[in-house]
Amino acid sequence: MTSATDKSIDRLVVNAKTRRRNSSVGKIDLGDTVPGFAAMPESAASKNEAKKRMKALTGDSKKDSDLLWKVWFSYREMNYRHSWLTPFFILVCVYSAYFLSGNRTESNPLHMFVAISYQVDGTDSYAKGIKDLSFVFFYMIFFTFLREFLMDVVIRPFTVYLNVTSEHRQKRMLEQMYAIFYCGVSGPFGLYIMYHSDLWLFKTKPMYRTYPDITNPFLFKIFYLGQAAFWAQQACVLVLQLEKPRKDYKELVFHHIVTLLLIWSSYVFHFTKMGLAIYITMDVSDFFLSLSKTLNYLNSVFTPFVFGLFVFFWIYLRHVVNIRILWSVLTEFRHEGNYVLNFATQQYKCWISLPIVFVLIAALQLVNLYWLFLILRILYRLIWQGIQKDERSDSDSDESAENEESKEKCE
């Protein structure tokens, strides 16, 4: 069994030392992927701070206060090396307090953080309210833990097993393999919810026919708020600018702003069916993007094939489906379901919301079109020139970064 596994891995992997230097499918940085803390490059300042902490830890303790400082520095050093520790402690404390209390109802103050709120009595449907923000905030912490833990404890050892020796390339793989995991779960989850709704295969008329969708089923609400937490957590990392900005940093920021506005407005103003479809288009296409990049890092012979699949799903989901949704806003928005402004009954599908919905989705489409142009350029070079180069990423310096890394090791 072990030899069979090794042979299958050998088909995917060629030693990193013999990897072709002109390939950069793995360097395509599209708008939905933001690096985790584990994949951040270590700056000179952070290295100096680490040296100071280690020096403080090795010094003699003359007073009790020195011992306390050592404990604090020890924790900081551990947290710096394993950034999932702090969110892990927070999650353990909250979950333990919640489950040990024996009160799993909404009367428990911790319920709004751990579980979704506003269940409609006697049904599987849930309304919306301010407590949903607490759920999103708590699961932002959860996704911070999940991302850093998987990268540090699961994915990094796997990259070492695959003989990825370059630290720079290893960090790139951490990002993409986590994206494969997340999108590999969220994409099918979203499709499952869509299959059990009237939206299957991205039908547009049901998006408006049952409006307003003031309540949502259990799984639907978990998926929607979970996605909101995931995107909000990514936005926080992006705002902190913990890594060198990519060439398309402005487009990346714009993409996240538009996405967060779409998430908030679609949830508050009851356009969640439309939001579900857009979530799925992004997750499924991102899965194939990250898969093609990971295979490219491994110098796999399957890279061109998977990259071709990625291009197909990107065009179909992010352009064909999204443009169909845009067209439905112009043609079906007014005629399917109620079309009236009534604050008392939470009816917001009216002449005011129509242009807002259209502009937000169109803005997202413009960013995707810009990225499509760059993707097609890469595809053209891959087919006609055998070069897989991406000018829009921050990876112009990828090889130089690896060279600098080699020099540091030699020194």
Swiss-Prot record:
InterPro entries: Lag1/Lac1-like, TLC-dom. The modification Phosphoserine is found at residues 23-24. GO terms for biological process: ceramide biosynthetic process. The chain crosses the membrane at residues 82-102, 135-155, 177-197, 212-232, 252-272, 297-317, 356-376. Residues 390-411 are annotated as: Disordered. It is an enzyme of class 2 (transferase). Its main location: endoplasmic reticulum. PROSITE patterns: TLC (PS50922). Residues 103-134, 198-211, 273-296, 377-411 are lumenal. PANTHER family: CERAMIDE SYNTHASE LAC1-RELATED, LONGEVITY ASSURANCE FACTOR 1 LAG1. Belongs to the sphingosine N-acyltransferase family. Component of the ceramide synthase complex required for C26-CoA-dependent ceramide synthesis. Redundant to LAC1. Facilitates ER-to-Golgi transport of GPI-anchored proteins. Involved in the aging process. This is Sphingosine N-acyltransferase LAG1.
